[in-house]
C-alpha cells in the first residue's frame, strides 16, 4: 500500500469509528425518547428525538465522506443500548457520553490532520460543535433535575399534555 493509500485508510478508519459511535447514540437516544414519551415527559421526549435526528445527520455525513474516500461505511454499533433508565439517570449518563464523544472526535480530528486530510478534520470540527450543544443541553437538564428534582419533572409533565377533545 502506498503512503497515500495508508493515509486515506487511516482517515476512513477514524470516520468509521465515529460513525459507529453515532449509530450507538441514535439507538440510545431514540430508546430514551420512547421511554420519556411513555412516562409523559413529552417536552423532554421531543428534545431527545431532535438530538437523535442530529446524530442521524452526523452519521450520514460521516458515511458520505467515507464513500467519497472509497471506503465502506460501517453498520456496527459502538455499544449496547442501556434500556429502562430512570429519568434522573438519563441526562447525567448522556452528558458523560457526549463528553466522551467530544474527546474521541478531537483525537480522530488529529488523525485526519496528521494524515493530511483537512476537509475531514473540518467535518469533525463542525460535528464537535454540535455535540457540544448536546452536552450543554444534557448538563442543563441534569442540573435542573438535581437541583429541583420532582418539582422540575412534574412541571414538564404538566406543560406537555395532549389537548383534550372539545
What are these regions, as identified by a protein language model?
Residues 25-28, 32, 36-76, 137-144:
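Conserved alpha-helical segments that form or flank metal/cofactor-binding pockets of metalloenzymes
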Residues 4, 40-41, 74-84, 106-129, ...:
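Acidic interhelical loop/turn segments
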Residues 4-14, 76-97:
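Acidic/His metal-coordination segments adjacent to aromatic residues that form catalytic metal sites
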Residues 61, 96-104:
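Amphipathic, heptad-repeat alpha-helices with coiled-coil/zipper character that mediate oligomerization
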Residues 14-18, 23-30, 102-106:
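A structural feature that tracks compact, well-ordered secondary-structure segments
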Residues 160-166:
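Conserved small/polar residues in nucleotide/adenosyl-binding loops
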